[in-house]
Every structure is written in structure tokens, then in C-alpha cells.
A protein has these predicted regions:
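Conserved radical SAM core fold
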Residues: 9-11, 45-47, 75-80, 91, ...
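Aromatic/hydrophobic pocket-lining residues that form the small-molecule binding cavity
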Residues: 23, 51, 78, 117, ...
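Alpha-helix N-cap and loop-to-helix initiation/capping positions
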Residues: 14-18, 22, 109-113, 141
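Short amphipathic alpha-helices and their capping/turn segments at secondary-structure boundaries
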Residues: 77-88, 150-151
Length: 176
């Protein structure tokens, strides 16, 4: 989204990014140290090739050494991954959604297919995932629509968290 990533952001070289094995190893170390809840976030974790194997492996610990395995996602892959997530032991997801207007949604996400995300949310609910919507409050963008999102979440029986923008350095000159 525009508030997280500048248009001309330079990505790390692949060799500098944690491998899936390293991610799983770190999670297992935390579990051995007594961590009871693991949340996988991103970027967008569900587009990472091979991530479902990590989720399946960590999901084997749910009910034993792990109380909860959750995913924070932009929702773009839920339509196709929700059932697999549930079967892997995920019971709750957080979905980032900052506007209910399709054009505004596309503007903030840069890819935005709000209807695809909504279909994914429907699928997630259908398979039994508990859903929390994360909405970043952005002045001059969605501050007058937060109540609308809250009402929609209530109607859909989704939990909602309103998040304040956290300045993370230069994100392309955006003043949010």
C-alpha cells in the first residue's frame, strides 16, 4: 500500500531475504522458548512460493506447543487459500482493508480488486476462519469513511482494528 511502500522502493536482493527454512526455524525457536502465538505477516505472505508448507508445518504445533497461528494478509489470495489455511491449523486471519470504495481501494493498494478481497473474505468465513479487518486511518483519504467500514464489519461479523499511520522513514513524500 502507498503508506507502507514508496513507488520506487528498492527491494532487498533475494540472498538477503530469509529463506522459508529460516523463517520456520526462527518460529520453532520461539515456540521452544515458550511463545504460544505466531503471526505470519508480510509484505503479503500468501504470495510467497512454498509458504503453505511452512504454515502446514507450524500448524502441526497448534494445540500442542502453540495456541494460535494467524496470518496477516491483504486478502488477495484468500479466495484460493482460505480452506488450505484452515486445514493447516490457522483459525484467525487479519485482513488489511482501508476503503470500501473500489476506486479508493485500488488507489491505496496499487493493485486493488476489492471484489476479489470480498470474495476471499466470504470464502474465509465459509471455511470457519475468524476475521479481523485492519484499517489504517489516513487523513484526507479515509477518515470520513471509518464509520462506514465499522458498520460493514459489524454487518459481516468481522472484528475491526483502526490503526494509526506509523512514519517509517521516506515513503515517497506521502504526508499521511
Amino acid at each position: 500500500c502507498t503508506y507502507c511502500m514508496a513507488e520506487d522502493m528498492q527491494f532487498l536482493p533475494k540472498k538477503d531475504i530469509l529463506s522459508l527454512e529460516e523463517i520456520e526455524d526462527i518460529c520453532r525457536i520461539f515456540i521452544k522458548l515458550g511463545t504460544r502465538k505466531i503471526r505470519l505477516t508480510g509484505g503479503e505472505p500468501l504470495v510467497r512460493k512454498g509458504i503453505m508448507q511452512v504454515i502446514n508445518n507450524l500448524g502441526e504445533e497448534v494445540g500442542n506447543y502453540l495456541d494460535e497461528l494467524t496470518i496477516t494478509t491483504n486478502g488477495s489470495q484468500l479466495e484460493f487459500k482460505a480452506e488450505e489455511l484452515y486445514n493447516a491449523g490457522v483459525r484467525r486471519i487479519n485482513v488489511s482493508l482501508d476503503h470500501l470504495d473500489p476506486d479508493k481501494f485500488r488507489e491505496i493498494t496499487r493493485w486493488g480488486d476489492l471484489e476479489k478481497v470480498k470474495r476471499g473474505l466470504d470464502k474465509a468465513r465459509e471455511v470457519g476462519l475468524k476475521i479481523k479487518i485492519n484499517t489504517v486511518a489516513i487523513s484526507n483519504f479515509n477518515q470520513n469513511h471509518l464509520a462506514e467500514i465499522l458498520r460493514w464489519c459489524g454487518k459481516e461479523n468481522f472484528d475491526m482494528t483502526i490503526i494509526e499511520v506509523m512514519p517509517m522513514g521516506d515513503i515517497g513524500g506521502d504526508k499521511r
